[in-house]
């Protein structure tokens, strides 16, 4: 996955606007800011605890087994550390307290398509990407760090990988990514962006460096790669090309059974809901061929999605 992240829709934009009030100077790098990243998210503790409470009450697979206050206390230890001296291991207790089982066949890894992943996963109803497990949910889209030479939080800016390797947010996602990989099992889904100019599979990215190495081969049936191309966007890479071929070769060398499909239809249909008249969204023989070649497409959950999306597309075209 990329650093922060699980590009939802209008609902996400509304949710974020309600959840992340903008303070003067927040959201853009202020003049004279020490670091290149956004500063600590206003009301960090309240947002963290609110997300935790919502998850454990409404979504958790293990209701009643998580203490959100204890999880916050374990997390906030890093807020007392130098902003460039935070290690993944500093989140160990936080991960241990917030960790829970990931349903078999429900893991979804990704690069460069955070919001599409969130939209398709549908709040754990369809799949469960890292940003939909508890230890990923509480920090998603947030930023945090201590001031460089003081004890308070830095609301002006926080370091990113451009500033220093051991920054608080990257360390968090490294730790979460490693645990997510260890806990994933069955069929592993990977969504890549085939329209990304730098390539669909970053060979130096979170998926490459902190997720693939921690997959437990004895727990995994196969890995399915979905290379999605943006509606109206370029086809920079597809299955068997460029960095995708590098990924396929790596999985082969590691002994994983794997397959790759371009523009996995259920996800493509979702992308086309807002672009129903675009040529990229026309149902054609190529789409039908991809459908026939992928047995997984006949799962009940995907069929229900496709039916609902086809209805939406038909309604849009008649409007």
Swiss-Prot record:
Residues 1-33 form the signal peptide. It is a lipid-anchor; GPI-anchor. Pancreatic islets, kidney, spleen, heart, thymus, intestine and salivary gland. Residues 295-319 form a propeptide. It catalyses: NAD(+) + H2O = ADP-D-ribose + nicotinamide + H(+); NAD(+) = cyclic ADP-beta-D-ribose + nicotinamide + H(+); cyclic ADP-beta-D-ribose + H2O = ADP-D-ribose. It is found in: Cell membrane. GO terms for molecular function: NAD+ nucleosidase activity, cyclic ADP-ribose generating; phosphorus-oxygen lyase activity; transferase activity. Its EC number is 3.2.2.6. GO terms for biological process: positive regulation of B cell proliferation; positive regulation of cell population proliferation; regulation of actin cytoskeleton organization; regulation of calcium-mediated signaling; regulation of cell-matrix adhesion; regulation of inflammatory response; regulation of neutrophil chemotaxis. It comes from the Eukaryota. A lipid is attached at residue 294 (GPI-anchor amidated serine). Nicotinamide binds at residue 110. Keywords: Cell membrane, Disulfide bond, Glycoprotein, GPI-anchor, Hydrolase, Lipoprotein, Membrane, NAD, Signal, Transferase. GO terms for cellular component: plasma membrane; side of membrane; uropod. NAD(+) binds at residues 110, 173, 211. Disulfide bonds join 52-68, 84-164, 145-158, 239-260, 272-281. Glycans are attached at residues 67, 96, 149, 193. InterPro entries: ADP-ribosyl_cyclase. Homodimer. Catalyzes both the synthesis of cyclic ADP-beta-D-ribose (cADPR) from NAD(+), and its hydrolysis to ADP-D-ribose (ADPR). Cyclic ADPR is known to serve as an endogenous second messenger that elicits calcium release from intracellular stores, and thus regulates the mobilization of intracellular calcium. May be involved in pre-B-cell growth. Belongs to the ADP-ribosyl cyclase family. This is ADP-ribosyl cyclase/cyclic ADP-ribose hydrolase 2. It comes from Rattus norvegicus. The gene is Bst1.
